[in-house]
Amino acid sequence: MKSSSFRRAIVPGVIALAAALTACGGGAEGASGTVAIDGSSTVFPLSNAAYELLQEENPDIKATVGQAGTSGGFEKFCAGETDLSDASRPIDEEEEVPVCKKNGVDYTELHVATDALTVVVNPDVDVDCLTTEQLIKLWEPKSKVDNWQDLDPSFPDKEISLFGPGTDSGTYDYMAGDVIGAESETTRTDYEASEDDNVLVQGVAGTPGATGYFGYTYYEENTDKLKALAIDDGNGCVEPSVDTAQSGEYTPLSRPLFVYVNNKAYKDTAAVKTFTDFYVDNLETIVEAAKFIPLSDEQLAETKDTHEGMSG
């Protein structure tokens, strides 16, 4: 399902950027058909922006852009139900890759942007920074933390309400497996969960004492409603930003974002090839439209090289 609130936020910028693309000649004219995309709610704004921009050049290509979560997206992708899969983590070598192989789904991984998983609080929470250890203590599977003072006696005596992604989300996987490092690869379960980051934004913004986490994009769209916490991983408090994510300073919460493309669909279906080519050829503009963290020059060159190899 598309996010109408996101569409309202980016449409003016998309129209302006699309005009620039059209003036330069995007080469996306002529093809028609449908493209099925699903997966990460974090990557959704990026792929949706690509579709909005492509529509300005070729309205005959129609796309469905879903938000089933990274794991849910890979389940559909490896079953051959979708052409592209948005992911906020690499495909799992032990569980998901064998399913793709079993079903004859050959694919290409494209690194499309960088994200900073952002820990936010309701503005009424007088806390500015958490250590990685405090973040783990808050979200680990057996956590009993329910008051801010449980993390630090100097924090406010205020009850904590928690909001976070559901278990199908790559954002959840990243927090559970990479940040917390729990053997069970789970977090605590007593929180309000949603695969839609907009629901999490509304929950934290509307609940005193609340905190949650999601991709940087959704925080940047809602800075008037939320406060982002800096994270101290041992070298002082570092705020989430484009610069700190690209430089690697914002650890352990920065991460790469991917789009996986079904190679057969790319070769056999004109609409899929046109969409994918447009996506990569205009990646910098699309990232700007969706307000993601762009790839470094080296990363962008690697992605373009990988894309060129798909036509070989």
Whereabouts are the PLM-identified features?
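Bacterial N-terminal signal peptides that target proteins for export
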Residues: K2-G13
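Exported/periplasmic ABC-transporter solute-binding proteins
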Residues: S3, G25-S71, E75-C78, T82-E94, ...
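Hydrophobic alpha-helical context, especially transmembrane and signal-peptide helices
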Residues: V14-A16, G30
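C-terminal motif of bacterial Sec signal peptides marking the signal peptidase cleavage site
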Residues: A18-A23
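Acidic/His-rich segments in extracytoplasmic proteins that coordinate ligands and/or metal ions
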Residues: E94-K102
